[in-house]
Amino acid sequence: MKKIIIKATCISALLLSTQGWCGNTSVDLRFGHNTRSDVNYSRIKVMHQANNGFYFSVEAAQNHNDTFFGDTDRYNPDDKGLTEAAQEIETRWRFDLGNGFAVAPGMVTVFTASNTHYRPFIQGWKAFDNGLNLSARYRYNTVNDAHSDKELDGSGYTRRQSHQFDIWFAYNIGKFGMSYNPRFRWQDNVDQGTGDDTYWEHTVAFNYKLDDGWTPYVELVSLDKTYINNDGNHENDYAVRLGIVKQL
């Protein structure tokens, strides 16, 4: 009897553990175009939200240069067609606090051809009964390159150690959803790609849930002074992104 109880306990623990890791798995395919810099890119992302609060995603980003699916030009080595940009892994563990509140620590790791980025974060949520959802996140961005970013005083290069703040306002009405995400990034006296030590980004997104787990969406993005014109001055860039999510 004792052996049976032990076996039953082990099997129950295994089943509970397995059920906890079950959840929703989705694939997200997105294409984007920056209007002022005339850049094309895409991203494919696989996400899993487990029932126990654990979230995991992997994604691969590609640059498409002059065309979305152009090949490399053998006579022009600068025209590389479709090229790999980066791979990203995100993990977080969400804890429900009750009354619509939740919090999650997490980590984003980005792999590029030249270095690896580490981005630990803490994120919180508040869901309301009227369909409104609020979320806020603080993220610390660093990289394994001691000379990754340019100092504004002209003294040289230093390691990226920037502070990033995001807020999401999301609202759902039936199958229709919309969101607004302002983002702010700062590192004292270090160029954020804007000619300044600050960076702002604003994203407005709309989505619509179709049958069989399909959800198309569009994102309209303002990128703070990341485009450098012919005179060497920084100007805002703008992006249009079209994507679709399929829940498996």
Task: Identify the role of each PLM range.
Residues 20-74, 86:
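Short glycine/proline- and aromatic-enriched beta-strand/turn motifs that initiate or cap beta-hairpins
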Residues 31-35, 60-66, 107-113, 138-144, ...:
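Transmembrane beta-strands of outer-membrane beta-barrel pores
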Residues 1-26, 248:
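Cleavable N-terminal export/targeting peptides
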